[in-house]
Curated annotation (Swiss-Prot):
The active site is at residues 154, 178, 244, 247, 270, 279. This is Tyrosine recombinase XerC. Disulfide bonds: none annotated. PROSITE patterns: CB, TYR_RECOMBINASE. The gene is xerC.
Length: 305
């Protein structure tokens, strides 16, 4: 078993990371292994300057790898993810005494331009969640959308929800987030009403998934993505609506109303407030639009144009 395979086994068995996280590590480290295997002489022999075993790499080898991935057209964000996986891998090797220093510790990928998350305005969000409940699966769709927008869950968190995680009388949901961290999140009154209706209709037990898939178990993330796109079209929305737009909209609208960045951080389950601060830029965009529409000098400037 290679060092990379051992590390992946450690992540799965000891760290018990999610399947999604494990797949991401596997893809990123597979790219490193493939690059190493491609470093051959004209005779097809492994280049003596590049070890076939990634555990023997130094920082120069990793810089060559990152440069090769960059030439291949990988985005700055993807390069950052590749390096993050490498740092975790080499930190694991270091902790186990396999290497004396991590070759990835000092390496930095190019900074990715920070894109602002796409959001729906309040009217658009309401139009999306108020899908007809008399259509096939209408009660489920309404409950799913209401919970998504009401509580700002991640897509993976929404799909994993079980009825036992919900306390509809108290209006709270216990969410198992990234890193197996639990957090309590409020559930709005419209979402509670939709969930009660959906549970009465489905007759589900406490251990059942709130939103089951066709084959049993939890609904897949892909199924939710497709369904939300379909529902957005049915509701006459012309934006390319994707699930995380509801989470982003939740965060943006809460921050816009309250100005409480720390509170939004806790609701979203962000470990680093810097991740939450992206929504302050959205709030500033909104304020800038209000200014342009309302400030007398802004209006005069617009009229002059």
């Amino acid at each position: 078993m290679s060092s990379v395979d051992e590390f992946l086994t450690y992540l799965q068995v000891e760290r018990q990371v999610s399947a999604h996280t494990l797949d991401a590590y596997r893809r990123d480290l597979a790219a490193l292994v493939v690059w190493a295997s491609e470093q051959k002489t004209d005779d097809g022999v492994q280049d003596a300057a590049v070890p076939a075993e990634t555990a023997q790499f130094d920082s120069a080898h990793l810089r060559q790898f990152v440069a090769a991935e960059h030439r291949r057209g990988l985005s700055a964000k993807s390069l950052q993810r590749r390096l993050s996986a490498c740092r975790s891998y080499y930190a694991w090797l270091l902790k186990r005494g396999r290497i004396s220093a991590s070759p990835a510790a000092a390496l930095r990928a190019p900074k990715a331009p920070r894109k602002l998350p796409q959001v729906l305005d309040a009217d658009e969000a309401v139009r999306l969640v108020e899908v007809p409940t008399d259509a096939p699966l209408g009660l489920r769709d309404r409950a799913l959308l209401e919970v998504f927008y009401s509580s700002g869950l991640r897509l993976s968190e929404l799909c994993a929800l079980r009825w036992r995680d919900l306390d509809l009388d108290s209006g709270l949901v216990m969410v198992l987030g990234k890193g197996s961290k639990q957090r309590l999140v409020p559930v709005g009154s419209h979402a509670i009403a939709a969930l009660r209706e959906w549970r009465r209709d489905s007759g589900a037990s406490a251990d059942s998934h709130v939103f089951p898939g066709r084959a049993g178990g939890a609904i897949s993330q892909r199924a939710v993505q497709i369904r939300i796109k379909q529902l957005a079209v049915r509701q006459g929305m012309f934006k390319d609506v994707h699930p995380h737009m509801l989470r982003h909209s939740f965060a943006s609208h809460i921050l816009e109303s309250s100005g409480d960045l720390r509170g939004v951080q806790e609701l979203l389950g962000h470990s680093d407030i810097a991740t939450t601060q992206i929504y302050t830029h959205l709030d500033f965009q909104h304020l800038a639009k209000v200014y342009d529409a309302a400030h007398p000098r802004a209006r005069r400037k617009k009229a002059a144009e």
